[in-house]
Amino acid sequence: MKVDFSRGQWDNAPLTYAYSFRFQETPVFAQEDDCIVNRKNDAFEQGFDNVTLMAEQPCAAGAAISATCSFEAYGAPLFVIAEKLHRCPDGTLRYGDYLEVVLYENGVNVWRMKMTDGKVRWVKLLGAEFPVTAGERHAFSARVTKTGLVIETCGRKFTLYVEDMYPSFYLGVSACEQINRFYDMEITEE
């Protein structure tokens, strides 16, 4: 599945909004001519909308997600790899056990998020430090294997072992912290 996020180009894409159980808000991306973008939102605890678009169908080991993205200072465009999507009574889709593969000014972080006692808790699995320029477009990808992740961006490649990797999962893009733009997204399966 390849999606161009330009205006009018992704209206029928098999994507759905989904949200972490960490947050109550359910914002959507704003449309710009050549991309989608999250917005400043003073009502949100971080001051910006935290928005995720997920593929509607689950994937298995061998699947990869890639995107062209950019971010303003302190932004954090990321991939979400969610074990399950839960339909809440209000119809909203949410996820609680998931991985975040985050691109930001100081490199790449990977976080494992787990729902415990009704709260999402997290642990950092990877902190690879290198400069990533805000305001520029970056190609970013993550392949899910049976035992972890292979991440590529900015001419660098990282292989990360992830204990108890999900046998099936949902993939998506998410805008977190500050302003983030996604120009395209592709999900491939082996």
Regions found by a protein language model. Give the residues of each.
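Beta-strand-rich interaction surfaces with strong enrichment in secreted/lumenal proteins
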Residues: V51-P58, L126-V132, L160, L171-G172
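Low-complexity, Ser/Thr/Pro/Gly-rich disordered linker/stalk regions
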Residues: M1-A63, G148
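Secretory/extracellular carbohydrate-interaction modules
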Residues: K40-K114
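Generic beta-strand structural signal
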Residues: A30-Q31, L103-Y104, V144-K146
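Flexible glycan-contacting loops in extracellular carbohydrate-active proteins
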Residues: L160-D184
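Extracellular beta-strand elements of beta-rich domains used
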Residues: F5, A142, Y183-I187
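Short tryptophan-centered beta-strand motifs in secreted/extracellular beta-sheet-rich domains
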Residues: I65-A67, G135-T145, L149-I151
